[in-house]
Curated annotation (Swiss-Prot):
Regulates cultivar-specific nodulation of soybean. Induction: By flavonoid signal compounds. This is Nodulation protein NolU. Keywords: Nodulation, Plasmid.
């Protein structure tokens, strides 16, 4: 008598291990600045095309692998909390840069100049810098609001880069990928290395108060 072949029972439970890694990868791909992704894929791609690729859920895990390195062992990656608690790295840089140049912020008093400055860096960064005047770094005063805004952005990004340089590669890249190519975060100076820890302790404390 011929016995019937056993029926294979398929496991219908989702692969939790895969999901736990694919979700952060998808978020990373979706939040990456388009210039970063275009540089890895094809610099000739239009911004609209890159954004469409980023929105494709099926492609997002593969794009994350491309951005972080194909040779990475994804099953061993520990996705810890985002270093900036999910906040915009440009905003973090502006907050740090405003502390750096807080002495100059106090010198911008005319309504016209103040409006131009706030338009560039935001009212919250302006107030944050003045509030932390005691931690200001720059002694040289900049009176022109446009030049001051540019320098705040430059030194803030450089401090962000210096602060990230001492973090693990995965955590560092998760933040850097959200910035466009070519910011000062990619090449901080020694002066930024020395000040970044103190400034970003204030920035992170501010973020934690905003999103406890």
């Amino acid at each position: 008598m011929k016995l019937p072949m056993p029926i294979a029972i398929q496991n219908t439970q989702p692969d939790v291990s895969f999901q736990s890694h694919s979700v952060p990868r998808s978020e990373l791909a979706a939040s990456t600045h388009p210039t970063r992704l275009a540089a890895r894929l094809d610099p000739e791609l239009s911004a609209a095309t890159v954004v469409q690729l980023q929105k494709c859920a099926r492609l997002q895990p593969r794009l994350a692998e491309l951005l972080l390195g194909n040779d990475m062992d994804w099953n061993r990656i520990g996705w810890g909390p985002d270093l900036l608690r999910g906040h915009d790295p440009r905003r973090a840089a502006l907050l740090a840069g405003s502390i750096w140049h807080a002495r100059s912020l106090l010198k911008v008093v005319s309504q016209r100049d103040l409006a131009r400055l706030v338009e560039r860096i935001g009212a919250d960064a302006h107030a944050f810098g003045i509030r932390h005047l005691a931690h200001a770094i720059a002694d040289k005063l900049i009176s022109d609001p446009e030049k001051l805004a540019l320098q705040i952005e430059h030194d803030g990004h450089a401090c962000l880069g210096a602060w990230l340089n001492i973090r693990p590669a995965l955590e560092r890249n998760r933040v850097l990928l959200r910035l466009p190519l070519g910011t000062a975060a990619e090449n901080p100076a020694p002066e930024h290395d020395g000040a970044s820890s103190g400034l970003f302790s204030l920035v992170i404390a501010h973020f934690e108060m905003e999103s406890p």
